[in-house]
Amino acid sequence: MSDTHELSLTRTIDAPPEKVWDVMVNRLEEWYCPAPWRAEIDRQERRAGGRCEMTFYGPVGEAMPQNGIYLAFDEGRRFVSTDAVVFGEDGDFEPAGPMMIGFWEIEPEGSGTRYTARARHWTEESRKQHVEMGFEAGWGACADQLKALCEA
């Protein structure tokens, strides 16, 4: 896939990778959605092919389901999900309106951790739409929230 359809950001976190990973996966609701919005996990199956379902709630009652599947869940290193596939009412995979494949990755860097979030899109139009939706501000706020939790 061409990297022209990818958006990414990186943060250096002054905490060991083990702590960052723990916060990433066990305190997801505290950092995964930019405040004042909040995320609630509806269902999370931490394995490739597992459900990744949550709802984002806005400050005036908005609700935005965020459903998909994990493509990879590499303990201590990364998780990858997509909204291109969801589970239907019969419990089987169904196609959905794809926007992206999301990557959330960590790796040791000095005495801390490098956190990288990437969004790969099927088309340039989809990538541009994500930029217009506020990728840098929104995903940047989430990364900063994660950083603050890990460094506290």
Place the predicted regions along the sequence by residue:
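Short beta-strand segments enriched in hydrophobic/aromatic residues
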Residues: 13, 24, 56-58, 85, ...
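Hydrophobic-ligand binding "helix-grip"
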Residues: 32-33, 40-48, 53, 59-110
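Beta-strand/loop substructures that line and gate deep hydrophobic ligand-binding cavities in soluble
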Residues: 6, 89-137
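Hydrophobic ligand-binding cavity/cleft-lining segments
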Residues: 1-39
